[in-house]
Each structure stands twice: as C-alpha cells, then as structure tokens.
UniProtKB/Swiss-Prot annotation:
Keyword Cell membrane attributed: no
Protein family according to the UniProt entry: Belongs to the transcriptional coactivator PC4 family.
GO CC terms: extracellular exosome; nucleolus; nucleoplasm; nucleus; transcription regulator complex
Residues in cross-link Glycyl lysine isopeptide (Lys-Gly) (interchain with G-Cter in SUMO2): 68
Highest taxon above the source species: Eukaryota
Oligomer status and interactors: Homodimer. Interacts with CSTF2.
Provenance organism: Homo sapiens
InterPro entries: PC4_C, ssDNA-bd_transcriptional_reg, Sub1/Tcp4-like
Any one GO molecular-function label of the UniProt entry: transcription coactivator activity
Stated name of the protein: Activated RNA polymerase II transcriptional coactivator p15
Length: 127
C-alpha cells in the first residue's frame, strides 16, 4: 500500500508536503537499521585483529624447529587441538608462511605416532 500512496502523492501537487514527510520517514527507517550493523562489523573486525595478534604470539611459543624451515607446531583450530608438522617459506616481506607440505594430527593420532616411534626407528636403521 505505501507504494500506491507514493504514486498518488507524487502525482498531486497538494500533497507535496506529505510526500516529503514520507520520504524523510523512509530515510530514517533505512538509516536506523544500517548503523547497528556497521557497529557490529567494526567490533568483529577489532576482535579478529586482537585475536590474530594473540595467536601470532602464541604460535611462536608453540613452534619447535626440527629442520631447516620445518617445524612442529601445536595450535587450536575451531576449538580442536592440532599438532602440525609442516614446511614453511619466507614471503617477500620476510614473514614465515606455512607451506603446502605438511600434516595436521589430532591428539589421538599424535599419541599413536609417539607409541610407534621405536618401531619407526628400527625400520630406519634396517634401511
């Protein structure tokens, strides 16, 4: 129904003030919902930035070098603990970035690997 009122009010010259009021009300209605959405987005980005700063410092604490540009790292991903064995590379800015080569183990898989270390060592010695 509001669309028909707009058409009628725009066609008649006597209701110009009514159409201006309608336009102002519509503008206010449109502006009001947008403001909270923008505030939420900026809050989310600031939270993301602060969490990324925290994760980068904790990532350094949980990285153990096992070779040239190869590391074992312990991290939290979507609420799950993962043990990564991964190669890293240096980007042009000098930052270390994770490479494609690597594997992520959950704690159960990590325990199974640790239990089989002696068997793996024996197999390496035989070769």
């Amino acid at each position: 129904m509001p669309k028909s009122k707009e058409l009628v009010s725009s066609s008649s010259s006597g209701s110009d003030s009514d159409s201006e009021v309608d336009k102002k009300l519509k503008r206010k209605k449109q502006v009001a919902p947008e403001k909270p959405v923008k505030k939420q987005k900026t809050g989310e980005t600031s939270r993301a930035l602060s969490s990324s700063k925290q994760s980068s410092s904790s990532r350094d604490d949980n990285m153990f070098q096992i070779g040239k540009m190869r590391y074992v790292s312990v991290r939290d991903f979507k609420g799950k603990v993962l043990i990564d064995i991964r190669e890293y590379w240096m980007d042009p800015e000098g930052e270390m970035k994770p490479g494609r080569k690597g594997i992520s183990l959950n704690p159960e898989q990590w325990s199974q690997l640790k239990e089989q270390i002696s068997d793996i060592d024996d197999a390496v010695r035989k070769l």
